A protein has these predicted regions:
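C-terminal alpha-helix plus adjacent terminal tail
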Residues: 3-5, 9-43, 200-206, 221-225, ...
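Conserved CoA-thioester-binding segment of acyl-CoA-metabolizing enzymes
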Residues: 8-88, 127
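Terminal peptide-recognition signature
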Residues: 48, 52, 67, 85, ...
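Hydrophobic alpha-helical membrane-association signature
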Residues: 63-66, 118-121, 223, 264
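Catalytic-core regions built around general acid/base machinery
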Residues: 70, 121-132
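Glycine- (often His-adjacent) and acidic-residue-rich active-site loop
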Residues: 87-125, 144, 256
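Crotonase-fold acyl-CoA enzyme core
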Residues: 127-242, 274, 279-282, 288
Length: 295
C-alpha cells in the first residue's frame, strides 16, 4: 500500500495573484504560506485532511481554494479511485471563518463583493464534490457546523465518530444558514432539516445516523480508518461504472418521476454497451472475478 503526503499550497506570485500548487509537505519554501489542507494517498484513495485546528478547520478563503485545487487535480487523476475528506483537531469544520468575513466590513462596499465571492467560491467547491466522477466520503471526528455540516451533507457518504456533533447554528448569530440549507434539505427529511435551521440545535452522531446525514457511526478515533476502508471497498469497482452511476444518481433526483425513468433507461442502455458491463456480466456468468478496463 502506497502512502504519500502532500500539502496543498497557495503561492503568492509577483503580480499579487495566487497560484494553486501541489508541493511535498517537507519542501515548503519560505515564501509559501502554511496550507490548511493536507493530501495523503493511501493506495488508490486520496485523503484530504483539513489541517487548521486553531480555526476549528474553518472554511476560510485559503481552505476553500485548497480544497477546490485538490479536487480539480483529482478529477482526471486515474490513480485516484475514491476520496476521503477528514480533519485534524477537535472540530471537523466550524464553517466559514467569521473573523475573516467581518474584517471586510471596512471595505468601501462594507464587504458585499467579498461576501458574494466567498459564498460563490464555497458553493462552487461543494458542487465540485457532487460532480466529481469519483465517490467522496466524509470522515467526521468532531463538531461539524454551518458550512462544515454542509460539506458532510454534500459528500456522497459519511462516517462519523460517536463523539461527532452536527448543527446549523447561524440563526443564533443572525445569519440563517442558507447555503448549508441546500445540502441539508437534500439529505435530511424536511421537517428535521427545518428544525436544525430554525433552532440552531446540535445533534449527536447517532441522531445524524437516524436522519440519514451520515451512513455509519464508529468509536471515536476509528472514523478515518473506517472511511478509508469504505472508500477502498468502492474503489475496486469499475471506475467507469462509478462515474456513470454517481452522475445519474444526482441528475435523476432533480427530475420528475417520468423524466427520471426515461433518463435512467437511457443511462442503463449506454452502460450496457460499455466494455466493463460486458466484462462484469461475463465474469458473473463464468463465476470469476472481473477485470475492469474502466471503459
Amino acid at each position: 500500500m502506497t502512502v504519500l503526503y502532500l500539502r496543498v499550497n497557495l503561492i503568492a506570485s509577483l503580480d499579487g495573484t495566487e497560484k494553486k500548487t501541489m508541493t511535498p509537505q517537507t519542501s515548503r519554501a519560505v515564501s509559501q504560506a502554511p496550507s490548511p489542507l493536507l493530501r495523503q494517498t493511501v493506495g488508490s484513495i486520496a485523503v484530504l485532511t483539513l489541517d487548521s485546528p486553531s480555526t476549528r478547520n474553518a472554511l476560510s478563503e485559503a481552505m476553500i481554494m485548497a480544497l477546490q485545487s485538490a479536487l480539480d487535480s483529482i478529477r482526471d487523476d486515474k490513480s485516484v479511485r475514491a476520496v476521503v475528506i477528514a480533519a485534524n483537531g477537535p472540530a471537523y469544520s466550524s464553517g466559514h471563518n467569521l473573523k475573516e468575513l467581518t474584517a471586510r466590513r471596512s471595505d468601501a462596499d462594507k464587504g458585499r463583493a467579498y461576501f458574494a465571492h466567498m459564498m460563490k467560491s464555497c458553493s462552487d467547491m461543494m458542487q465540485t464534490i457532487v460532480r466529481l466522477p469519483k465517490p467522496v466520503v466524509a470522515a467526521v471526528q468532531g463538531v461539524a457546523t454551518a458550512a462544515g455540516c454542509q460539506m458532510v451533507a454534500t459528500c456522497d457518504l459519511a462516517v462519523a465518530s460517536d463523539q461527532a456533533t452536527f448543527g446549523t447554528p447561524g440563526i443564533d448569530i443572525g445569519l440563517f444558514c442558507s447555503t448549508p440549507m441546500v445540502a441539508l434539505t437534500r439529505n435530511v427529511p424536511r421537517k428535521h432539516a427545518m428544525h436544525m435551521l430554525l433552532t440552531g440545535d446540535h445533534i449527536p452522531a447517532q441522531r445524524a445516523l437516524e436522519l440519514g446525514l451520515v451512513n455509519s457511526v464508529v468509536p471515536a478515533g476509528s472514523e478515518r480508518e473506517a472511511a478509508i476502508a469504505l472508500a477502498d471497498r468502492i474503489a475496486v469497482k469499475s471506475a467507469y461504472t462509478l462515474k456513470v452511476g454517481k452522475e445519474a444518481f444526482y441528475r435523476q433526483a432533480e427530475m420528475s418521476l417520468a423524466d427520471a425513468y426515461t433518463y435512467a433507461a437511457q443511462v442503463m442502455t449506454e452502460n450496457m454497451m460499455a466494455r466493463d458491463a460486458q466484462e462484469g456480466i461475463g465474469a458473473f456468468i463464468e463465476k470469476r472475478d472481473p477485470k475492469w478496463e474502466d471503459r
